[in-house]
Amino acid sequence: ILTELFAVIEDRKANLPDDSYTASLFTHEKGENAVLEKLGEETTELILAAKDDDHEEIAHESADIVYHLLVLLAMKDMDVADLRAELADRR
């Protein structure tokens, strides 16, 4: 699913459809800071969900973090393979 999601993100980056939240992140006036702020916000929400032991919210916020992380990778001209390689090196 990560590869599929990343392909959609790359498509939005290339085509910048007007009605796409993902595309709006690539054209945001704050640039990558908009994504970095979202990552911080979503991480805080994940911490709060974990403290509340709210499994549904933990899954939701984790997905938000993964999504925004993939957008950041695309902004930096990286991809899922870079992430996989780093994780493999840590085995």
Segments from the language model and where they lie:
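Flexible "arm" and connector segments at domain edges
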Residues: I1-S62, V66-R91
